[in-house]
Structure formats: C-alpha cells, structure tokens
Swiss-Prot record:
5-methyltetrahydropteroyltri-L-glutamate binds at residues 18-21, 112, 550, 594. It comes from Staphylococcus aureus (strain MSSA476). Pathway: Amino-acid biosynthesis; L-methionine biosynthesis via de novo pathway; L-methionine from L-homocysteine (MetE route): step 1/1. L-methionine binds at residues 420-422, 473, 588. The active site is at residue 683. Its cofactor is Zn(2+). This is 5-methyltetrahydropteroyltriglutamate--homocysteine methyltransferase. Catalyzes the transfer of a methyl group from 5-methyltetrahydrofolate to homocysteine resulting in methionine formation. Coiled coil: none annotated. L-homocysteine binds at residues 420-422, 473, 588. Keywords: Amino-acid biosynthesis, Metal-binding, Methionine biosynthesis, Methyltransferase, Repeat, Transferase, Zinc.
C-alpha cells in the first residue's frame, strides 16, 4: 500500500495574538531593544515550528518566517538593494527602511501578492550588484535543525522573483541568468547543511504569461541540473492551474500543484498522464486561503485518484497558510458556524487526519472531522429573498450633467483637496473602543468621546485648509470588519488576524449567511461631523467588491450572488446618508483589482460583475450627490476601462510608490471623470516636501484635465501619528495653494 506524507508551504507569522506585530512596532517606537526584538521573534518562530511538528508534518517550512516580507528577504539575500539605500550594512534596520522609508528616502513600492490581500515589497534593480550577501535562510534552517525539526527551506524562485521586480537596464532573461549562480550558491549551502529538499516557489508559472517564461524557466532549471542541485528542488505553484506537461519536463525532484483554486484543471492533467511519476507530487488539497473546514470525505476521494497516478505523494495546503488566522482555540463562536471553520492550525489537523487514515488505517480523527462537517452542512444559511431588479444600476444623468449640479451645490475651488477617510487611531481611541466593547464604559461615555474626537479633527482639517472633510472613522477598527459587525450574515472573530503588509494586520469577517442591512451604520457620526462645519463632509463606506474580497466568503453560493447581496446593503446606507443631507459619499473599492483572476479568460466576467455591484450600491442617488471611490495601487492597465465604467464622480488612487508608473495607464484612455492620484505615501512616516507634492501634481496634470483633478494623500491615515498627519497635510495644502496661483 502506498503511503502518503504531509507538508506545509508556510505558516502565519503574526502569532495567535499578534505577538509578531507588537514586537516589531515596539522596536520601531524604541520601546524595546534589538536584542529583545530578536528574542521575541525567535521564540515565536520556535513556537510555529514546534506546533507544526506536533501535527506530525513530515517536512516543515523555514524561510516563510520574516521580519517584514519574504520577497524583501530575498532581495537582501541577493544584494538587490534600492540605489538610494546602498552603501549601508545589510541588516534588519536597512530592511525596515527599505520597506517603510525614512526621513531621507522614500520606501520601495508595495504591491499585492497575486490576487491576495498580502502585499510584497517590490525589488528594485537600478544599479545593483547582485551577490549572496545575507543568508538568513541558512541561519533559520540551522535553527530548525537545532530544535530537531525536519525542515525544508523555502525561497521564491528566480522566475517569480525577477518578474515581480522593477527597474534596471537588463532584460528579464538577463536578470534571471544573473541570479542563477547566486541561487546555486544558496542551494548548495542548504544542501551541505542537510536539506533533504528545497521548496522553490514559482507562482508566476500559473499566470497567463507563463508560456512566455517557459524557455528561460527551462534554461534556469537545466542550469541547476548541471550544477547537481536540481533533484533537491521542488517547484511549488499555487492560486491557479499550472501547465503540468511543461513543469513535468523540468529536471527537478518534485512539483507542487493547487487542487483547490484550479477549477479542476490540475486533476484533469494528472489523469491525462501529464505528470512525470518519477517525481514527487506535492498536492495542495486543503484550502490555504479560506477558513472553511474541508469536506474531508471529498479529500479522501481526491487522494485516491492522485495515488493512481503517482509513486510518491505529499499532501499539503493549496498555498502558504499566511492568508488565514492561526487558530480557533481562543475563539468563542456560536457552534452552528464555528463547527464549519478551520484556521491554520486546524488545517494541519485535517492533514494529520488524512495521513493517519491512509498510513495507519486510523479513522478516529477522520470520522470526527467528517461528522463535524456534515453537521455544519445540514444547517440552512439561505433564508432571504432579494429583489435585485428594483434597484438602479446607472445614474440618472451622464457625468457632464451631474458635475454641473454638484459644483453648484459644493462650490469647490480649483484642485480641490481631501483625504481618503481615516485619521490616526491613537492609543486613546483604541482604549476607549476596547473599553466600550468589553462594557467597561457606558454607551454614553463612548459616544461623548467619539464626538469630541470628531470635533477635534474637523477643526484640524479646517485649520489646515482642506476643502472636503471626513469625520475620521474613529468608531471603526477596520474598514471591512466594521461593516461585518453591523450587517446581518457576517461573523466577526476575536483573534482571526492575518497579515496584510509589514506589521499591518487585518481581521477579515466571515460571511456565512445571507447579507442584509437592518439599520443605519454610519449616519450618526457623519451627520454630527457635518453639523460642525460649512464645508462638505464625506460619508465613508466600503464597497461590495472590497467587502467580499477582504472577507472570508461563503462557498455555498456563487460569488456574484453574495457580492450583489452586499451591494444592496450598501445601497441602503448610501440612501440613508443622502436622506440625512450628506452631499458627498465615498464608497471605497481598494480591493477591486486584487480580486482579478490570474487567468484572463475569467477577467471579463469578474469585471462585469464588479462594476454591476458597485453601480447597485451607488446609482440610486440624485445627480447632485457626488459619489467618490478609492482604490489601492496595483497594475491598473488591465482594468482601466472597468474603472471608468464604475461611473464614480471622483476616484482617488494610491500611486505615490509607483513613482509615476500609473500615469502611463491613462495615456490610452480619455478619462473624463473626476480623479485624484495620491501625491504622497501614507505607509511611510516620512513627511513629503512641498516640491515633491508639486512634482506629483504636475506629472498628473500632463494626462488629466485640471478641472477634473483632486489632490489627496495615497490612502487612509489611520496608521500614522497625529503630528505626521498634520505636518504632511499642511505641506499638501500649501503646495496646492501655490499651484492655484500659477
């Protein structure tokens, strides 16, 4: 009888209660020493390794743990240091400065990791001298060995690493070839240290362009074969289907495939005989991106099918578990929903149950998980009927007519200024919210505090001279979780944190049932803020596409249906704000681009559904009500027409870290709606100069009609300190005032 093995691609860094985040931010704030930071993170890494060992994984990843981002780790490993940061010792402080910027230099670009909500730091190739310079991977592998952990090193592969990079005069192929001797050196050091195999992540090979990379991919892995290391390499792909026949022809020891998010194609390729049985198959059968418990019986059937076409089978999650929370152990959830959930730790338990069943004929754990899954499935979460047809999906008049009415009503100046929505969540804000949630203070005391904070920041905005104000979102812990707490059909966890970028953690709500608006969500705070000023105050909402993409979605209904349910709920809130006298309403869609499928054959339908959902949420307002939206930076070229089709009166886009790249996306489209391209980077504590903001404005006006252009920061200001915000916004307003005089 063929036995199976179990493995993992990566584990969450945050810790069960965000110990990782707290330690790093304490170090940045100079509250702990570097030695204390190192000890805390070493202890957390040890805890992660031993936890995975407890679930009897045959091999446990190292190299997934990082102080910020694994792509940035790889950049430092190979001395791919941005030119402005060169000449310094390559250490953790340099790593943090590249990621966050400092008073002298801007940070490197931050971009979504494929179609997830994780962000990586983009490697920069301008005037670099690649070499192996900081082999932290080897250190961490040796540390795992010291714990008697059977570990395998993890590194992003050369094809993916270079493709996710920017800058430099070399071609894509030349950059890959430059790195091959360096990868070889790293591989040899790991093999010499005892690595049985090395996990080489090449998710770029599941994208549309993967065929265009096949020649250089073959050349790269042929190089590793000639160097005598290829058989120790396992190429891992995830998030979509791969071209299996090509991958099987590469001279490596094993291949990892995603059998969850591949729409069934990878299994079809296996059954068609496209897999080279001399290799080990690493089968991603447990969903690494969602929190629902596996249909364990269906996974058994899948394993049986795979065993018929393989000689060596390793089962694993479909991707790194970085994208899900650590554990359910600390949650106190309603059993009706809780039984259907599985976080990172529970997913390891599912792997262990299958290993025991196949290798030891031990079905105790398997039977328990099977019964639990069946109990959850026997419940009904489809209880509501929806009348989608009765809601408008287009505005009453074209933009050219609407903008005249809006300008007459708002009376805004040339180059109007605004912010994206949130202001700093100080320790005091967080304490009051926690005290209120834990019933340590009364509703009245909390409401009084919120009103005082709103009033204080309305005055700050007026004193600075902004044109369209916001209430600051002090009542919100997160732009999606807040709505998850208030809309029917969502479940909010206590410790369900996942990493978004760097130390930024989010707690995605879980959509388990039909979504419904039952009462106003934001009206009281927005109306109060508007009562304090004659300037317009924006209502601030999160859009349906983003709420869905930044939640753990239910899987018993099509995405479009769930998305439209959310859209109807947001539409109710939009109309409630309008009825309360709010003249400008922002419905943010920062996650619209990141949800774009990796394969272009699915793009058109995704974008069509996204545009319709946004219009369901926003089109019922009167012409004189101005609808804004906001998006985070990514490669917008693929969706620029869909952005236009949203028909938002104003869109603001995070652009400063793109170093002007986004402007190119507007060269091929006559964008005739209002737009604000972020003029400074809010992810960095660095205060922009007046000259930098003026340059950003001038660059934008080369492509965008001045009468349509707004000036704003990149994103919400929640994570910045109060003085940083006031100083940066003052510079922004002064730059705009000077520009108006030209």
């Amino acid at each position: 009888m063929t036995t199976i093995k179990t493995s993992n691609l990566g584990f969450p860094r945050l810790g069960r209660k965000r110990e990782w985040k707290k330690a790093i931010e304490s170090y940045w704030a100079k509250k702990i020493s570097k030695e204390e930071l190192d000890q805390t993170l070493t202890d957390l890494h040890k805890e992660n390794l031993l936890l995975q060992k407890y679930y009897h994984l045959d091999s446990i990843p190292v190299g997934d743990f990082s102080l910020y981002d694994h792509i940035l780790d790889t950049s430092l490993l190979f001395n791919i240091i941005p030119e402005r940061f060169q000449g310094r010792t390559i250490d953790d402080d340099l790593l943090f400065d590249i990621a966050r910027g400092n008073k002298d230099h801007v940070a490197s670009a931050l971009i979504k990791w494929f179609n997830t909500n994780y962000h990586y730091i983009v490697p920069e190739w301008d005037n670099v001298e690649p070499k192996v310079s900081r082999n932290v991977l080897l250190d961490r592998f040796k540390y795992a060995q010291s714990l008697n952990v059977n570990a395998h090193p993890v590194i992003v592969g050369p094809i993916t690493f270079v493709k996710l990079s920017k800058g430099g005069h070399q071609t894509f192929e030349e950059k890959v070839k430059t790195l091959l001797p360096l990868y070889k050196e790293v591989f040899e050091s790991l093999i010499d240290a005892g690595a049985e195999y090395i996990q080489v992540d090449e998710p770029i090979l599941v994208t549309d362009d993967s065929e265009s990379y096949e020649n250089i991919t073959r050349e790269a892995y042929d190089y590793f074969e000639k160097a005598g290391v290829a058989k120790k390499l396992v190429i891992q792909t995830y998030f979509e289907r791969a071209h299996l026949k090509f991958l099987s022809s590469l001279p490596v020891g094993g291949l990892g495939l995603d059998f969850v998010h591949d729409n069934g194609y990878n299994l079809k390729q296996i059954e068609a005989g496209d897999f080279d049985k001399s290799k080990t198959l690493y089968a991603g059968i447990i969903d690494g991106r969602n929190v629902w418990a596996s249909d364990i019986e269906a996974k058994k059937v899948l394993i049986d099918k795979l065993l018929a076409h393989t000689n060596e089978l390793v089962i694993q999650p479909s991707s790194s578990l970085l994208h899900v929370p650590v554990s359910l152990d600390d949650e106190t959830l309603d059993t009706s929903v809780g039984e259907g959930l599985s976080f990172a730790t529970e997913k390891l338990d599912e792997l262990d149950a299958l290993r025991r069943l196949f290798n030891q004929n031990d079905s105790v754990k398997y039977d328990k998980l099977k019964a639990r899954y069946e109990r959850f499935q026997n419940q009904s979460f489809k209880n509501l009927d929806y009348d989608f047809e009765s809601v408008r999906t287009s505005r009453q008049s074209p933009f050219a007519q609407r903008i005249e009415q809006q300008q007459k009503r708002l009376n805004l100046p040339d180059l109007p200024t605004t912010t994206i929505g949130s202001f700093p969540q100080s320790r005091e804000v967080r304490k009051y919210r926690a005290d209120w949630k834990n019933k340590r203070i009364t509703d009245e005391a909390y409401e009084t505090f919120l009103k005082n904070e709103i009033a204080r920041w309305i005055k700050i905005q007026e004193d600075i001279g902004l044109d369209v104000l916001v209430h600051g979102e002090f009542e919100r812990n997160d732009m999606v979780e807040f709505f998850g707490e208030k809309l029917q059909g969502f479940l909010v966890t206590k410790f369900g944190w996942v990493q978004s970028y760097g130390s930024r953690a989010v707690k995605p709500p879980i959509i388990y049932g039909d979504v419904k608006w039952t009462a106003p969500l934001t009206v009281d705070e927005t109306v109060y803020a508007q009562s304090l000023t004659d300037k317009p105050v924006k209502g601030m909402l999160t859009g349906p596409v983003t709420i869905l993409n930044w939640s753990f979605e239910r899987v018993d209904l099509p995405r479009k249906v769930v998305q439209d349910q959310i859209a109807l709920a947001i539409n109710e809130e939009v109309l409630a704000l309008e009825a309360a006298g709010i003249k400008v309403i922002q419905v943010d869609e920062p996650a619209l681009r990141e949800g774009l499928p990796l394969r272009s054959e699915y793009h058109e339908q995704y974008l069509k559904d996204a545009v319709l959902s946004f219009k369901l949420a926003t089109s019922s307002v009167r012409d004189e009500t101005q609808i804004h939206t906001h998006m985070c930076y990514s490669q917008f070229g693929q969706i620029i027409h869909a952005i236009h089709d949203l028909d938002a009166d104003v869109i603001s886009i995070e652009t400063s870290r793109s170093h002007g790249d986004l402007i190119k996306d507007f060269e091929d489209i006559n964008y005739d709606l209002g737009i604000g391209l972020g003029v400074y980077d809010i992810h960095s504590p660095r205060i922009p100069t007046k000259e930098e903001i003026t340059t950003a404005i001038n660059r934008s006006l080369q492509q965008i009609d001045r009468s349509l252009f707004w000036v704003n920061p990149d994103c919400g200001l929640k994570t910045r300190k109060e003085e940083e915000v006031k100083d940066a916004l003052t510079v922004l307003v002064n730059a705009v005032k000077a520009k108006r005089q030209e």
